[in-house]
């Protein structure tokens, strides 16, 4: 089913917007921009913006972070290039704690990030806590991804853990929009249409010295991925982000069209 067709039936406003955006821009590429200065962060995103549907941030690694200096320009770039924002916070505490972590502190994630994510380790309370924080913080729709599987070597997120995480996701059809996973997570027979976002996607490298394992674009899209997450493949090792952004966007879209046939 096409992204637009899925958007028409999706219960989540966040997922609807993202799926339509993907079809409009003809991209299923999410850029993971992990750099340490605001200037480099914003410069890379401005260059990658035309090619992406989503930017994934780790906002707490930016050394000179400020809300006015980092977040406000990020939101302007999102508007300029028509992409959404995913803060890869990986919440993993009890509901009451994550509620404060999501809405408050220095980063105030719920104010600006369309999507965030969480581990299932503490149970379904984490979904409730994050949803409450979103509702109390902003009138803008927000979405949550559950971490069902990871791309790192030796990850413990598999088997029964993954199955239990899927069960937690079923607790909220509107707020939980999908998973960080390596494959399709099912659910359609129960009325769910989860977005699958997959990190560890590379057209060139096979991995790194710290346990990251890369799979090809065609491989992940053919096994159910909706959005490919690419980081260093776009700008690491002296790569040109505009050249690589176009390359990964085209590869991702071609693989998606092949899946539709």
UniProtKB/Swiss-Prot annotation:
Top-tier EC class: lyase
Protein EC: 4.1.1.23
Chain residues that bind substrate: 34, 56-58, 88-97, 214, 232
Catalytic activity: orotidine 5'-phosphate + H(+) = UMP + CO2
Keyword annotations: Decarboxylase, Lyase, Pyrimidine biosynthesis
Family, per entry: Belongs to the OMP decarboxylase family.
Designated name of the protein: Orotidine 5'-phosphate decarboxylase
Name of the encoding gene: URA3
């Amino acid at each position: 089913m096409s992204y637009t067709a899925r958007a028409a039936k999706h219960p989540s406003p966040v997922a609807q917007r993202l799926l339509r955006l993907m079809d409009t821009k003809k991209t299923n590429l999410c850029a993971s921009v992990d750099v340490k200065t605001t200037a480099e962060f914003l410069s890379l995103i401005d260059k990658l913006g035309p090619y992406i549907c989503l930017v994934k941030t780790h906002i707490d690694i930016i050394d000179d972070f400020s809300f006015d200096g980092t977040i406000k320009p990020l939101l302007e770039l999102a508007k300029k290039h028509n992409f959404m924002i995913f803060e890869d916070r990986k919440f993993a505490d009890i509901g009451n704690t994550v509620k404060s972590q999501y809405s408050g502190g220095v980063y105030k994630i719920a104010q600006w990030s369309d999507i965030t994510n969480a581990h299932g380790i503490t149970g379904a309370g984490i979904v409730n806590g994050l949803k409450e924080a979103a509702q109390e913080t902003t009138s803008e729709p927000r979405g949550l991804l559950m971490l069902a599987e990871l791309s790192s070597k030796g990850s413990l997120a598999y088997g029964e853990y993954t199955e239990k995480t899927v069960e937690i996701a079923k607790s909220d059809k509107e707020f939980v929009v999908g998973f960080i996973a390596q494959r399709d997570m099912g659910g359609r027979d129960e009325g769910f249409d989860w977005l699958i976002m997959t990190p560890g996607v590379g057209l060139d490298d096979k991995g790194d010295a710290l346990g990251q394992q890369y799979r090809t674009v065609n491989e992940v899209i053919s096994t159910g991925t909706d959005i490919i997450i690419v980081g260093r493949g776009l700008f690491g090792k002296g790569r040109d982000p505009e050249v690589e952004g176009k390359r990964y966007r085209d590869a991702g879209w071609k693989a998606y069209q092949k899946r539709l046939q």
